[in-house]
């Protein structure tokens, strides 16, 4: 059961709701949004009488939701949630870009270069990769110490320039470093989506998050993980899509993005960096447009993986998407 407080509900009114929940033998989970606070009642809901809560001061409505994602659901809060990072608002209906930091870049030079990018223009934030691994078995492994030192230095220079920085982590042991470098956003790779300890730790933070699903996950996995984080109190969640299985490798998960957009109110990021390599045959601009129309309001791009033009007649397709038939 979800109790939605009014926009200007006071702390005293919130305590009144919590008191009634506890008197019924239930426990509460609180999620504080920018405009409204949601209170989840956890326990045997057979003792729950919605009208007794609707009569309390400060309560806007009570919603009985049976799905596994409740705090983040459209039933609890129909309007889109907004996540604000250094005065930049994510999720308000305009497309924004999060851009991977290029090797050797400095923030101001990267911004000047990105502003001339004909595909997506100036990024709203940069993504640092202090824990990047070599995916190819015979590729030289990155120097972990150097990568972390560079990420810290980059973060400090970005802050001096007023540019938000996200830090990508892949497991719970890396969270402390990301917090230590004062990242504006914690970007959690799909590897950690179903890590319960990670979900609980993220929920206790007061830091914006990008919570990613990988090709091995379902959209339901995505929403359940976000709900676990929200139940711990952190409502600053952006859903991140790292693709779905395709015939030639991961593809943009248009169906998953559309499903999540319909089911929950959280902003959605589509990682199109893996799909803008030459063998994808779609430009970053085209992929971003597809993602935006599916429901994503943020895209992650990689300036070092530029799109090559198709060699045959300008025809384009994407791995996992059928090529249009010739007439």
Which residues make up each language-model segment?
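Short, acidic/polar
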Residues: 49, 106-117, 170-176, 283-288
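Catalytic beta/alpha-barrel core
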Residues: 6, 127-129, 142-145, 162-172, ...
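Alpha-helix-loop-beta-strand connector modules within alpha/beta enzyme cores
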Residues: 138-167, 201-208, 257-268, 313-327
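Active-site mouth loops of central-metabolism enzymes
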Residues: 93-113, 166-168, 274-282
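N-terminal amphipathic alpha-helix/helix-capping segment at the start of soluble metabolic enzymes
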Residues: 69-105
């Amino acid at each position: 059961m979800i109790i939605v407080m009014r926009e200007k509900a006071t702390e005293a009114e919130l305590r009144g709701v919590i008191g009634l929940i506890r008197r019924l033998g239930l426990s509460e989970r609180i999620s504080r949004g920018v405009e409204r606070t949601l209170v989840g009642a956890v326990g045997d809901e057979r003792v729950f009488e919605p009208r007794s809560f609707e009569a309390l001061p400060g309560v806007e409505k009570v919603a009985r939701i049976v799905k596994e994602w409740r705090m983040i659901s459209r039933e609890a809060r129909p309007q889109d949630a907004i996540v604000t990072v250094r005065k930049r608002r994510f999720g308000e209906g305009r497309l924004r870009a999060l851009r991977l930091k290029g090797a050797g870049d400095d923030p101001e030079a990267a911004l000047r270069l990105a502003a001339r990018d004909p595909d997506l223009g100036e990024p709203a934030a940069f993504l640092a990769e202090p824990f990047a691994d070599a995916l190819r078995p015979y590729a030289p492994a990155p120097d972990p110490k150097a990568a972390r030192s560079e990420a810290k230095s980059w973060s400090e220079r970005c802050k001096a320039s007023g540019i938000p920085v996200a830090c990508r982590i892949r497991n719970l042991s890396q969270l402390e470093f990301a917090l230590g470098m004062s990242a504006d956003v914690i970007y959690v790779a799909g590897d950690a989506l179903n890590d319960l300890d990670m979900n609980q730790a993220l929920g206790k933070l007061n830091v914006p998050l990008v919570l990613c699903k990988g090709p091995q996950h379902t959209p339901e996995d995505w929403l359940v993980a976000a709900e676990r984080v929200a139940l711990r109190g952190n409502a600053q969640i952006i859903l991140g899509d790292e693709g779905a299985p395709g015939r030639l490798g991961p593809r943009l998960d248009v169906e998953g993005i559309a499903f999540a957009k319909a089911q929950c109110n959280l902003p959605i990021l589509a990682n199109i960096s893996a799909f803008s390599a030459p063998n994808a045959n779609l430009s970053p601009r085209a992929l971003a447009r597809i993602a935006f129309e599916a429901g994503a309001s943020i895209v992650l791009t990689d300036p070092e993986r530029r799109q090559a033009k198709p060699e045959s007649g300008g025809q384009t397709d994407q791995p996992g998407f059928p090529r249009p038939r010739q007439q």
